[in-house]
Amino acid sequence: MKRTKSIHHASFRKSWSARHLTPVALAVTAVFMLAGCEKSDETVSLYQNADDCSAANPGKSAECTTAYNNALKEAERTAPKYATREDCVAEFGEGQCQQAPAQAGMAPENQAQAQQSSGSFWMPLMAGYMMGRLMGGGAGFAQQPLFSSKNPASPAYGKYTDAAGKNYGAAQPGRTMTVPKTAMAPKPATTTTVTRGGFGESVAKQSAMQRSAAGTSTRSMGG
């Protein structure tokens, strides 16, 4: 009986300790989660070209040129592609489209379809690029091409957007902003052509999701 009593007392002590330590454990977990969130964000700079970057970063001209050229290559690989020039212009505006290199991520059957309709496929010009530190703390820089529409009817009008349609605010180079580290991750190559207005729809959906997420965050902070 004494032994049984001892076991019950031990169980009681463990139960009491668990109940009283749980809030502390939760608090510690919350701190680590917050720390993780802080580390998941990154400050990036937005530039129109290598000259803008060099002017803002004296002594970093070589790095700026490398980042700009890498962004151009990434734009060729990931930008929305259109079967005709007219489809691209309808989305991004006159003077904002160019013929895309035939090897820029398109599957052979899609290349054939595009070339049959217009001799090539089309993509928007890179309007600017984001530049930030490499993920993992490397010494180099990461970059992400940005696109912008000059067609007032497009959801991307006057805004910087990435290849996935995510909106990064006004198409105004020379500013800095905080973005999730995932924003700088390479985007998948474009392997199919986009229908007219399709990219604008992606931008509209992404913007709605961003507003919804921001509203949820504000309500959570406000209790």
From Swiss-Prot:
The family database entries (InterPro entries) matched by this protein are listed as: Biofilm_formation_YgiB (IPR009576)
Q: Which Pfam families does this entry report, sorted A to Z?
A: DUF1190
* Region forming the signal peptide: none
Stretches the record annotates as Disordered: 201-223
* Residue stretches of biased makeup (Polar residues): 204-223
Gene behind the chain: ygiB
Name the protein family.
Belongs to the UPF0441 family.
Question: What is the source species?
Answer: Salmonella arizonae (strain ATCC BAA-731 / CDC346-86 / RSK2980)
Which protein, by its recorded name, is this?
UPF0441 protein YgiB
Which NCBIfam families does this one have?
PRK11653.1 (NF008655)
